[in-house]
């Protein structure tokens, strides 16, 4: 029985709310594809660069969670995945929510307990 092939790198994409900027990045945080509409130039280079960095960070978080799942399917023990710092799917969702709150502020009047 052969083990499943694990890709050398995991990649994920993140898109801004308006769908005008998309970044694909590796689990190492390296952007491998950046696409944006020409209209984004109107906000200036610093704003466009900041949006690209934000989306790179978000896609890297998703890619790291995807990488964890790939390695787990290949038989890597949970303890090793934890030591590698690869987040679980839920931890990735929590981190993305935290980033959203930092970007937009709290979206609920309810207090976290």
Outline where the language-model segments fall.
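Acidic, negatively charged sequence signal
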Residues: 1-22, 36-113
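Short, acidic, Ser/Thr-enriched surface-loop or helix-capping motifs
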Residues: 25-26
């Amino acid at each position: 029985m052969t083990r499943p092939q694990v890709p050398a790198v995991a990649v994920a994409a993140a898109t801004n709310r308006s769908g005008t900027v998309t970044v694909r990045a590796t689990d190492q945080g390296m952007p491998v594809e950046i696409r944006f509409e020409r209209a984004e130039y109107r906000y200036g280079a610093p704003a466009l660069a900041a949006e690209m960095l934000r989306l790179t960070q978000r896609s890297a978080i998703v890619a790291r969670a995807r990488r964890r799942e790939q390695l787990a399917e290949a038989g890597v023990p949970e303890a090793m995945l934890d030591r590698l710092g690869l987040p679980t799917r839920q931890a990735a969702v929590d981190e993305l929510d935290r980033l959203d709150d930092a970007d937009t502020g709290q979206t609920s009047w309810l207090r976290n307990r």
